[in-house]
From Swiss-Prot:
<feature type="region of interest" description="Disordered">
    <location>
        <begin position="950"/>
        <end position="969"/>
    </location>
</feature>
<dbReference type="GO" id="GO:0016579">
    <property type="term" value="P:protein deubiquitination"/>
</dbReference>
<feature type="modified residue" description="Phosphoserine">
    <location>
        <position position="613"/>
    </location>
</feature>
<feature type="active site" description="Proton acceptor">
    <location>
        <position position="302"/>
    </location>
</feature>
<keyword id="KW-0597">Phosphoprotein</keyword>
<comment type="function">
    <text>Deubiquitinase that specifically mediates 'Lys-63'-linked deubiquitination of substrates with a polyubiquitin chain composed of at least 3 ubiquitins. Specifically recognizes ubiquitin chain in position S2 and catalyzes cleavage of polyubiquitin within 'Lys-63'-linked chains. Not able to deubiquitinate substrates with shorter ubiquitin chains. Mediates deubiquitination of PLK4, maintaining PLK4 stability by reducing its ubiquitination-mediated degradation.</text>
</comment>
<feature type="binding site">
    <location>
        <position position="69"/>
    </location>
    <ligand>
        <name>Zn(2+) 1</name>
    </ligand>
</feature>
<feature type="compositionally biased region" description="Polar residues">
    <location>
        <begin position="459"/>
        <end position="471"/>
    </location>
</feature>
<dbReference type="InterPro" id="IPR028889">
    <property type="entry name" value="USP_dom"/>
</dbReference>
<feature type="binding site">
    <location>
        <position position="166"/>
    </location>
    <ligand>
        <name>Zn(2+) 3</name>
    </ligand>
</feature>
<feature type="domain" description="USP">
    <location>
        <begin position="31"/>
        <end position="352"/>
    </location>
</feature>
<feature type="compositionally biased region" description="Low complexity">
    <location>
        <begin position="499"/>
        <end position="512"/>
    </location>
</feature>
<feature type="binding site">
    <location>
        <position position="145"/>
    </location>
    <ligand>
        <name>Zn(2+) 2</name>
    </ligand>
</feature>
<feature type="binding site">
    <location>
        <position position="67"/>
    </location>
    <ligand>
        <name>Zn(2+) 1</name>
    </ligand>
</feature>
<feature type="binding site">
    <location>
        <position position="77"/>
    </location>
    <ligand>
        <name>Zn(2+) 1</name>
    </ligand>
</feature>
<dbReference type="GO" id="GO:0004843">
    <property type="term" value="F:cysteine-type deubiquitinase activity"/>
</dbReference>
<feature type="region of interest" description="Disordered">
    <location>
        <begin position="1525"/>
        <end position="1562"/>
    </location>
</feature>
C-alpha cells in the first residue's frame, strides 16, 4: 500500500517493525479499517481512527476497565475490542463490524447508524462519546456529568453557558448552561468572519483563529436585550471547564461548497480556548492551547480522516483500509484536501499536555481499557498519551513522545485537567453573569477578556493576531456585540452539534433549532466545489509552519521561539494563513501558546515532533512567546494573507477582496470595546503570562518528558520514535559522560605525547579507545552519536597506531623511555589483561627514552612504584615503599624514565588491586611524581619505605618529588647511580620483579633505601632509568662509576646500618606488596631494558659475596617477589620476609665488605643496600635457606622470579632498552655493584633458592665478585663503547647477563644441586645461571632453562608462555599474579611482546621468572621453569644486539659463564641463567657466542629466566633487543604477540639476529653484559646508539 511506503518512508520502518516494539500501538498508526462494499462504514471508520489516535482518549479509554455492558449493543465493548486489535493485531486492516453492529443496535430505535446506511461522521463521533459516557457513568446525565473518569465529559465535553449582556442597558440574560461534545460552526459564517477580520487587521495572526471561530459561532446569533431595551445583543458563551480535546464541527451548506478551500486555509492548527469562547472561567482553560491533531473530511459522500501521529510527527490519511503518510506539515494536509476537494467536517484540537482520566477517577472497570488506550499512537494531541504513559507504562516508544508532549501538555495540564467536576454550571453562570449583569460592562469585560485572549494569541502567534486583526470588524462587533451576535452564531453552532449528536438531548434542547439547518448541509456537502483551488492549501496548512513560511518568516522565527506554538502553528496557521491569509497562522499560533503549540505538535500535527514546524516544539516558549507576540504583532501589521496571492475559490476571492481593505489591526477591532489600551495592557499581561506559562510549560515538559521517557505511550511509529528517543535520552547522560571521559583521556594522551611520553600516551590512548568502544555501543541507537563516536574512535586508533609506530621507531633509548612509561602503567596494569599490560610495556619503552636523562630524577621516587606494579602484584606496595630509597640510591637518572614509566605503569597499577594500584595509579597518572621518590636520600628513602611499607597500598605515597630530587641529584651526580642501581637492580630487573623486589626489600630494609633506587629500575623504572641515564652514563661513565661506587659505599654503610637496625625487614615486607605489581611490570620492562644492566648486576651479585648476594637477591628479591612485602618474600624463600631480611642482614653484614666493594665499584648506595639485602638473602641461603630457596625457588623463587619474570616480560623488553640505558647509566658505577650485586642477583634472582641455598655463597660471592669485577672490567674495557670506568664492577655485575649463559647452565646445576651446586663464587654461579641458559643450546635453553624458569614460577619464559610473553613489559615480577597483563603490554608496547609474556602461575613467583625467561628468549635455567620462553622476545632483536654487542664481552661472559657453570651451586641459579640469557641476547653476544646456544638462547632465556641474575641478563638483553627492535620495533616488523608463540625459536636464530639487527647500540649494552665492565659499557653504548 502506498501509505505503507509513505509511512515507512518517514523512517519509521515497516509497519510490523513499527509495531514490533508495542504490537498494536505500533501498528495502530498504519492500520486501516475495512469498509466492504455496501457497508458504508466510512463515517464510523473515520470516527474510530480519530478516537484511536487521540492520545488522551486512547490512554483514558485504556484505563477504563469496567462499564455498564449492553451486550451485543455495547459500544464500549466493541471499542475495547477494536482498540485491542489496533494495539495488538498484526493485521494492517481491521474490521469495524462489531462496533458498527453495536452502534446500529444502540441507535436502532432512532434509526441512525444502521448497517449499510451512510451516516454523519461527526455525529457518529459525538454519539460514540456519549455512549461511552453512558457505559461508564450512565447514572449521571450527560449535561451535568461530573464523573472524573468519564472520558467524554472530562476530556471532550465543553461545559458552557450562554448569556446575553446588553451593552446599552447592561441587562443580562439568565445563563443557559449546556454541555456540548462538538462545537459546531457554520462554514459560511467562518468564511465571512475571516473576511471581516482580515479587513480589520493588517496582518492575520495565529491567534486570530480562535477569535475567528468565536465570531463565526456567534455571528448572526443576535438576541433581544433581556430588558427589551431594543438592543440586539450577540450571545456570549462562557467556557466553564477545561476540555483537553475540542471538537469543532464545521457545518456546510452544501456537499459541494465552494468554500471548502477557504475553510481549509482558514483553519488554524492552534486553538486557544480563551479565543474560542467569550470567556473562560477555568484557569487551565485560559492557559490551554490545543493543537489540531485530527480532521474528518467529507467528499463524494465518503468520509476520510487526517490525523497527526505524534510519534512519527506526521500527518496520516486514513481512508478506510488505506493509510497514507501525508507529511509532517499541516500544509501537506491542506494541499491534499484542496486537491481532493475534501470538506473538513470535524476538527479535533487536543492539548499536548492533556492527560488521561486519572486511574483513581476511573471506575474499577475503566482501568481495563487503559491498556488499549496506551496502544494509541499519539495521534491525538498526545495529552492522553502523555497521561496514560505517565499513569501506566508508556508505550514502548510513547515515553519520548509523551515526554515531548508532556512538556507541552504540562503547560496545559493546568488548563487541560478538567475540573474533577465541571464547575457547576449554575455557579459558573452566576459568576459569569455577575460581570455580565452590567451588560455593557459585562460585554466590555468579556470583550476585554476576549481581547486579552486574542491579543495574547496574537502576540503569541502573529499570524493569528493578524487574522484576528483582519477579523477585527467582527471582533469589534464581537466585543460590543457578543451578546447580540452570539444568538445566531450559537444556534448555528448548536445546530451543527445537535445535528450530529443523537444523544444531545440537553444540547439539542439548547441548540436543537440549529441542528436541522447544518446537518443536512453537511451531508449534502459538495467537497469538490470547495476544493477547486489549491492555492490556499499553503496558507491553510501553514498555520504553524506555513504561516511563518507564507505569512512571515518572522512568524516562523517566532515559532522557532515558540517551538510548540510554531509547530502547531505551522499546521494550522498555514491554512488559516491561506484562507485568512497569513493572519490565520499567526492567530492560530497566538491561540496556541508556543508551549501549547509545542505540545500539540508533539502530540499532533504541530506537536513538538511535528517536522512541519520550523522550530522545535520543545523550544522554550516563554521567551519565544513574547518574541513571537512582538514579532507577530509587527508581522500582523505588515502581514498580508498569503492566500490572497493564491488562486482562491469564490469565497476566497471574496475574502481576498475584503482583505484588500486596509487591515486595521487588532487594536482596530478592539476600539469597539474600550479595550485598546486595556487590551494593550492586557496584552502585556497576557504576554507576561504567556512567557510565564511557557516557562512553566518548559519545566513541565521536561518533567513530563522524563516521565514519558520512562513510560512511553504512543503506538507504532510514535512509540518507535519515542523508544529511540528514550534510548538516546536514557543513555544520553551515560553516553555523553562516557564520551567526555574518553575525550579527556584522549586529550591527556595527546598531552603526554607532546611531552614525549609516547608509552604513557599510548596507554591512555588505548584506554580512550576502549571507552570509545563502549560509548559507541551506547550510541548505537543514534546515528549521529555513532558517527561522532566512531570518528573519535578512528582518530584514537590512528593515534594509538602512530604512537606504537613512533615508539617502535624511536631509538632504543627513546623507546625504553616510552616503555618505561608504558611499563609503569603496565606494571600497575599487570593484573590487567595482557593487552593492557602490553600498552604499559610500550609506554615503558617510550618512557625510557624520554625519561633517560631527566625523568629518571623525576621518576626516582616513582620508579619503585612502577617497578612494584611491574614486578609483582603484592610486592608493588613494598616496591613502592622502598622505591623512593632505591630511587635515591639507584635511580636518579632513571627517575625520569621511571617517572614516565610510572605514569603508564600507574595506570596499570590502578588496575592492580594486589599491586597497590592505588599507589601506582597515583604514580601512573603521576609517573613523574612517583619517579621522584627514587632520588630520596637513603635515610629519607628508608623512612619513606618504612612509611610506604606501612601503607603498601600507598606506593605513590612516597614523596615522589623528594625521591625525584634525590634521583635527580643522583642523576646529576652521575647517571651511573641509576645505572648502578639498575645494575644493582638488574637482578631485580633480571628477576622480573624479583630483583626489583629485592632491591625494594633492601629499600624496605635498612639497605632498602639503597635498594630502592634500584627498585625504580625494576620493570619499568630501571628501563627508564637506563634509558634516561644511559646517555648520561655514557657521558659520565667514569664519574658515574665513581659516584655510584661512592653512593654504593655510602648506601652500603647506611643500608648496612639500617639493615642491622632491622628496618630492612620491615621495608622488605612492605616492599614486596607494593613492588609485587609495580616491580613485576616495571622490572619486567627493566629486565627487557635493563637486561644488560641486570645481567651485569647479576654478575655483580655473583661477584658479590654470597652473603651480599643472598641479602641482596634473596632478601630484596624474595620479598619483592612476594605478593606482599612479606608474602612475596615468603613465596620466594618460603620464609617470612622478616626472617629472610634478618638473616640476610647478618649475611649481608658478613659480606658487607664485598657488597660494599661491589656496590662502591659498580653500584650506588642503593646498589650497595641492595647488595646488603642480597647478602642478607645469601646469608639466609648460607644459613641453610639456600636449599630451601632451591626448593622454594620453584615455588617462592617463582615469586621472586615472577618479579624477575614479570619484569623481564614487561621489563625485559623495556629492560632491553632500559638496560641499554642503564648499562650506560650504570656503566660508571654499576661495575662493582653489579658484579657483587649481580652475583647476588644471579644467584637470588634467577632462582632465589640457589642463592639462599648457597650457604658458602658469601665467600664465593666475594671471590666471584672480585673475579667478576675483573672480568666485567675487562669486558667493559673490551667493549669500552660506553667507556665506563666503573663498568669494570658494573660489567662484572652485568656479566651475569653474559654470565647468564653460564649461570643458566649453572642455574640448572644449581637446580640439580640446590645447595652446593652453586659455584663457590657468586660470580661463577651468576655466570652459570646467566650463561647456562645461553650455554645450553637453544633447544636446551628453551626446554631446560625455561622449564626451570617456569619451575621458578616463570611460565612466561616457556614457549607455552610465549603468548603471555607477548606482553612481557606488562608482566609483574610475579607473573602468576598478573599473567594476562604481559599480553596487554605487548599490544600496547610492541617491544614487550618480544620479551614474551611471562606465564605467571596464579600463586607462584616462578611465573614471573618464567616470564623473565620468555622475555629474554634465552633458555630457561634448568632450575627455573621458564618453559614459556618469550615468543615475543625472539621478536625482540636481543640476539642480534647481543651478538653484535657482545663481541668483546662474550669472552668475559664466557669466563664468567665458565665460573658460573663451574660452580655447581650456581645451578639453582639456572633461573637466572635462563632469565639472564635473554638479557644476554640483548647484551651478551660474547656470552652467547662463547656459550653457544646459551647465548643464542639468551633472548629466550631472558624470557624464561625468572631468576634475578638471568632476569638481569634478560633485562639487559631485552632492553637492548627491545630498544633496538622490539621496543623500537625498528628492526622488528611489529610488536610481537606475547600471547602467541613465535613462529620460530628466536633464542637460537631470530633473537640473535634480531639482536644483531636491533642494536648497534644495544650490542654495546649486551657486550657490557657479557663483559661485566666492558659489557656494561658496551650495552650502555648500544643503548645509547639504539636509543639515542
Amino acid at each position: 500500500m502506498s501509505w505503507k511506503r509513505n509511512y515507512f518512508s518517514g523512517g519509521r520502518g515497516s509497519v510490523q517493525g513499527m509495531f514490533a516494539p508495542r504490537s498494536s500501538m505500533s501498528i495502530a498508526p498504519s492500520k486501516g479499517l475495512s469498509n466492504e462494499p455496501g457497508q458504508n462504514s466510512c463515517f464510523l471508520n473515520s470516527a474510530l481512527q480519530v478516537l484511536w489516535h487521540l492520545d488522551i482518549f486512547r490512554r483514558s479509554f485504556r484505563q477504563l476497565t469496567s462499564h455498564k455492558c449492553m451486550g451485543d449493543s455495547c459500544i464500549f465493548c466493541a471499542l475495547k475490542g477494536i482498540f485491542k486489535q489496533f494495539q495488538c493485531s498484526s493485521e494492517k486492516v481491521l474490521p469495524s463490524d462489531t462496533l458498527r453492529s453495536a452502534l446500529a443496535k444502540t441507535f436502532q430505535d432512532e434509526q441512525r447508524f444502521q448497517l449499510g446506511i451512510m451516516d454523519d461522521a461527526a455525529e457518529c463521533f459525538e454519539n460514540l462519546l456519549m455512549r461511552i459516557h453512558f457505559h461508564i457513568a450512565d447514572e449521571t446525565k450527560e449535561d451535568i456529568c461530573t464523573a472524573p473518569h468519564c472520558i467524554s465529559h472530562q476530556k471532550f465535553a465543553m461545559t458552557l453557558f450562554e448569556q446575553c449582556v446588553c451593552t446599552s442597558c447592561g441587562a443580562t440574560s439568565d445563563p443557559l448552561p449546556f454541555i456540548q461534545m462538538v462545537h459546531y460552526i457554520s462554514t459560511t459564517s467562518l468564511c465571512n468572519q475571516a473576511i471581516c477580520m482580515l479587513e480589520k487587521r493588517e496582518k492575520p495572526s495565529p491567534g486570530m483563529f480562535g477569535e475567528l471561530l468565536q465570531n463565526a459561532s456567534t455571528m448572526g446569533d443576535l438576541r433581544d436585550c433581556p430588558s427589551n431595551c431594543g438592543e440586539r445583543i450577540r450571545i456570549r458563551r462562557v467556557l466553564m471547564n477545561a476540555p483537553q480535546i475540542i471538537t469543532i464541527g464545521l457545518v456546510w451548506d452544501s456537499d459541494h461548497s465552494d468554500l471548502a478551500e477557504d475553510v481549509i486555509h482558514s483553519l488554524g492548527t492552534c486553538l486557544k480556548l480563551g479565543d474560542l469562547f467569550f470567556r473562560v472561567t477555568d484557569d487551565r482553560a485560559k492557559q490551554s492551547e490545543l493543537y489540531l491533531v485530527g480532521m474528518i473530511c467529507y467528499y463524494g459522500k465518503h468520509y476520510s480522516t487526517f490525523f497527526f501521529q505524534t510519534k512519527i510527527r506526521k500527518w496520516m490519511y486514513f481512508d478506510d483500509a488505506h493509510v497514507k503518510e501525508i507529511g509532517p506539515k499541516w500544509k501537506d494536509v491542506v494541499t491534499k484536501c484542496i486537491k481532493g476537494h475534501y470538506q473538513p467536517l470535524l476538527l479535533l484540537y487536543a492539548d499536548p499536555q492533556g492527560t488521561p482520566v486519572s486511574a483513581q477517577d476511573l471506575p474499577p472497570h475503566a482501568q481495563l481499557l487503559s491498556h488499549t488506550k496506551t496502544c494509541y499512537d499519539s495521534e491525538d494531541s498526545g495529552h492522553l498519551t502523555d497521561s496514560e504513559c505517565n499513569q501506566k507504562h508508556t508505550t514502548k516508544k510513547g515515553p519520548l513522545v509523551e515526554r515531548r508532549r508532556g512538556s507541552g501538555r504540562i503547560r496545559r495540564k493546568a488548563d487541560a485537567p478538567q475540573a474533577s467536576g465541571y464547575h457547576s454550571e449554575g455557579e459558573t453562570l452566576k459568576e459569569k453573569q455577575a460581570p455580565r449583569n452590567a451588560s455593557k460592562s459585562s460585554s466590555t469585560s468579556r470583550l476585554k477578556d476576549f481581547k486579552e485572549t486574542v491579543s495574547n494569541m496574537i502576540h503569541s502567534r502573529p499570524s493569528l493576531a493578524s487574522q484576528t486583526n483582519a477579523a477585527s470588524p467582527c471582533v469589534g462587533r464581537a466585543g460590543d456585540q457578543p451578546d447580540k451576535i452570539p444568538a445566531r452564531n450559537l444556534p448555528l453552532h448548536s445546530r451543527g452539534w445537535e445535528t450530529e449528536s443523537t444523544s444531545s438531548e440537553a444540547r439539542s434542547s439548547s441548540s436543537s433549532k440549529y441542528r436541522p439547518t447544518w446537518r443536512p448541509k453537511r451531508e449534502s456537502l459538495n467537497i469538490d466545489s470547495i476544493f477547486s483551488k489549491d492555492k490556499r492549501k499553503h496558507c491553510g496548512y501553514t498555520q504553524l509552519k506555513t504561516f511563518p513560511e507564507d505569512a512571515a518568516k518572522e512568524f516562523a522565527q517566532d515559532e522557532v521561539s515558540n517551538p510548540v506554538a510554531n509547530d502547531i502553528k505551522d499546521g494550522g496557521p498555514s491554512s488559516q494563513h491561506k484562507l485568512w491569509g497569513t493572519a490565520r497562522p499567526g492567530s492560530h499560533l497566538l491561540e496556541q501558546h508556543p508551549r501549547l503549540i509545542q505540545r500539540m505538535e508533539s502530540g499532533y500535527e504541530s506537536s513538538e515532533r511535528n517536522s512541519s514546524s520550523p522550530v522545535s516544539l520543545d523550544a522554550a516558549p516563554p521567551e519565544c512567546l513574547n518574541v513571537y507576540r512582538d514579532q507577530s504583532t509587527k508581522r500582523a501589521v505588515g502581514f498580508v494573507p498569503s492566500w490572497r496571492h493564491i488562486p482562491k475559490s469564490h469565497s476566497s476571492s471574496i475574502l481576498e477582496v475584503d482583505s484588500t481593505a486596509p487591515v486595521t489591526g487588532w487594536t482596530e477591532t478592539q476600539p469597539f470595546s474600550d479595550g485598546e489600551i486595556t487590551s494593550k495592557s492586557e496584552l502585556d499581561e497576557l504576554q507576561e503570562e504567556v512567557a510565564r506559562r511557557a516557562q512553566e510549560q518548559e519545566l513541565r515538559k521536561k518533567r513530563e518528558k522524563e516521565l514519558e521517557a520512562a513510560k512511553g505511550f504512543n503506538p507504532h511509529p510514535s512509540r518507535y520514535m519515542d523508544l529511540d528517543e528514550l534510548q538516546n535520552q536514557g543513555r544520553s547522560d551515560g553516553f555523553e559522560r562516557s564520551l567526555q571521559e574518553a575525550n579527556s583521556v584522549f586529550e591527556e594522551s595527546l598531552h603526554l605525547e607532546q611531552e614525549g611520553d609516547c608509552a604513557a600516551a599510548l596507554a591512555l590512548c588505548n584506554e580512550a579507545i576502549s571507552k570509545l568502544r563502549l560509548t559507541l555501543h551506547d550510541a548505537s541507537s543514534s546515528t549521529h552519536s555513532r558517527a561522532l563516536v566512531d570518528k573519535k574512535l578512528q582518530i584514537s586508533i590512528r593515534k594509538a597506531r602512530s604512537l606504537q609506530d613512533r615508539m617502535q621507531q624511536q631509538p632504543p633509548s627513546q623507546q625504553p623511555v616510552q616503555p618505561s612509561a608504558s611499563l609503569p602503567s603496565q606494571g600497575g596494569g599487570l593484573p590487567q589483561p595482557t593487552s593492557e599490560q602490553s600498552v604499559p610495556l610500550q609506554v615503558l619503552l617510550s618512557q625510557q627514552t624520554q625519561l633517560e636523562p631527566c625523568k629518571d630524577s623525576e621518576l626516582g621516587a616513582t620508579s619503585p612504584f612502577f617497578h612494584s606494579p611491574a614486578s609483582c602484584p603484592e610486592p608493588h606496595s613494598s616496591l613502592v615503599s622502598p622505591s623512593p630509597a632505591q630511587s635515591v640510591s639507584q635511580h636518579s637518572p632513571p627517575g625520569t624514565s621511571a617517572l614516565k614509566l610510572l605514569k603508564s605503569f600507574e595506570v596499570d597499577i590502578v588496575n592492580h588491586s594486589a599491586f597497590h594500584r592505588q599507589d601506582l595509579p597515583k604514580a601512573t597518572g603521576r609517573t613523574e611524581m612517583n619517579s621522584q621518590h627514587e632520588c630520596l636520600p637513603f635515610d629519607a628513602l628508608e623512612d619513606r619505605l618504612q612509611g610506604h611499607r606501612e601503607d603498601n597500598s600507598c606506593c605513590s605515597k612516597f614523596p615522589p618529588q623528594e625521591g625525584r630530587d634525590t634521583t635527580q641529584d643522583q642523576l646529576l651526580e652521575g647517571r651511573k647511580t641509576p645505572v648502578d642501581i639498575s645494575m644493582g637492580m638488574p637482578w631485580s630487573h633480571s628477576a622480573g620483579g624479583a630483583t626489583s623486589e629485592r632491591v625494594m626489600h633492601s629499600l624496605n630494609s635498612p639497605s632498602s633505601p639503597s635498594a630502592q633506587p634500584a627498585v625504580p629500575p625494576y620493570g619499568a623504572c630501571h628501563p627508564i632509568m637506563s634509558a634516561a641515564a644511559s646517555p648520561v652514563l655514557h657521558a659520565a661513565d667514569p664519574m658515574q662509576k665513581l659516584n655510584q661506587h661512592l653512593q654504593a659505599q655510602s648506601l652500603q654503610t647506611s643500608l648496612a646500618s639500617k639493615v642491622v637496625r632491622g628496618s630492612e625487614e620491615p621495608y622488605r615486607p612492605e616492599f614486596p606488596s607494593t613492588k609485587g605489581l609495580v616491580r613485576s611490570l616495571a622490572e619486567q620492562f627493566q629486565k627487557i631494558r635493563n637486561t644488560s644492566t641486570r645481567d651485569v648486576i647479576g654478575s655483580q651479585d655473583r661477584s658479590l659475596p654470597n652473603g651480599l648476594r643472598k641479602s641482596s637477591s634473596p632478601s630484596d628479591f624474595m620479598l619483592p617477589l612476594s605478593q606482599g612485602p612479606e608474602k612475596e618474600h615468603c613465596r620466594w624463600v618460603n620464609q617470612p620476609p622478616s626472617p629472610d631480611g634478618r638473616e640476610r642482614q647478618p649475611c649481608w653484614e658478613e659480606p658487607a665488605g664485598h657488597p660494599s666493594v661491589s656496590i662502591d665499584s659498580g653500584l650506588p648506595n642503593g646498589e650497595a643496600s641492595r647488595r646488603r639485602q642480597p647478602r642478607l638473602a645469601e646469608a639466609d641461603i648460607y644459613q641453610g635457606k639456600l636449599p630451601q630457596v632451591t626448593d622454594t625457588r620453584p615455588t617462592e623463587l617463582g615469586s621472586s622470579v615472577s618479579l624477575g619474570t614479570s619484569l623481564p616480560l614487561d621489563s625485559w623488553v623495556n629492560v632491553t632498552r632500559l638496560c641499554d640505558s642503564q648499562v650506560k647509566h650504570r656503566a660508571p658505577g654499576l661495575g662493582v655493584k653489579s658484579s657483587s650485586h649481580d652475583s647476588r642477583t644471579c644467584v637470588t634472582y634467577p632462582e632465589r633458592n640457589p642463592i639462599l641455598l648457597h650457604p658458602h655463597w658469601n665467600q664465593d660471592t666475594e671471590q666471584e665478585t672480585s673475579e667478576l669485577e675483573s672480568l666485567y672490567q675487562a669486558s667493559l674495557q673490551a667493549s669500552s663503547h660506553t667507556g665506563y670506568s666503573d663498568w669494570r664492577s658494573q660489567d662484572v655485575a652485568w656479566q651475569p647477563l653474559s654470565l647468564t649463559g653460564s649461570a643458566d647452565g649453572m642455574g640448572r646445576r644449581l637446580h640439580s644441586a640446590p645447595g652446593l651446586d652453586l659455584s663457590k663464587t657468586p660470580t661463577a654461579e651468576m655466570e652459570r645461571i646467566l650463561y647456562e641458559p645461553s650455554t645450553v643450546p637453544v633447544s636446551q635453553d628453551s626446554s631446560n632453562v625455561r622449564k626451570k624458569t617456569l619451575e621458578t614460577g616463570h611460565h612466561c619464559s616457556s614457549s607455552s608462555s610465549l603468548p603471555v610473553i607477548h606482553d612481557p613489559p606488562v608482566f609483574l615480577l610475579d607473573p602468576k599474579l598478573y599473567p594476562p597483563q604481559p599480553q596487554f603490554l605487548s599490544p600496547d608496547v610492541l617491544m614487550p611482546s618480544m620479551a614474551g609474556e611471562p606465564y605467571r602461575s596464579p600463586g607462584t613467583s616462578r611465573s614471573v621468572q618464567q616470564f623473565l625467561a620468555m622475555c629474554d628468549r634465552d633458555e630457561t635455567p634448568q632450575g627455573v621453569k621458564y618453559t614459556g620462553r618469550t615468543l615475543n622476545y625472539r621478536s625482540l632483536p636481543h640476539r642480534s644486539r647481543t651478538d653484535a654487542s657482545w663481541g668483546p664481552g662474550t669472552e668475559t661472559n664466557q669466563h664468567i659463564g665458565a665460573r658460573v657453570l663451574t660452580a655447581p651451586a650456581c645451578k639453582p641459579q639456572l633461573t637466572y641463567t635462563a632469565t639472564l640469557p635473554e638479557r644476554h641476547q640483548g647484551l651478551q653476544v660474547p656470552h652467547a657466542q662463547s656459550w653457544g646456544n646459551l647465548f643464542h638462547l639468551p633472548s629466550h632465556p631472558s624470557a624464561v629466566h625468572p631468576g634475578s641474575p638471568p632476569s638481569s641478563s634478560l633485562h639487559v638483553l631485552h632492553r637492548s633487543s627491545w630498544n633496538s627492535g622490539s621496543v623500537l620495533g625498528s628492526r622488528t616488523p611489529g610488536p610481537r604477540r606475547i600471547d602467541v608463540p613465535p613462529d620460530d625459536d628466536g633464542r637460537q636464530s631470530q633473537y640473535p639476529s634480531q639482536y644483531r639487527h636491533r642494536s648497534a647500540g644495544e650490542e654495546r649494552v649486551r657486550f657490557a653484559l657479557s663483559n661485566t665492565a666492558g659489557t656494561e659499557q658496551s650495552r650502555v653504548r648500544l643503548l645509547q646508539h639504539s636509543r639515542w
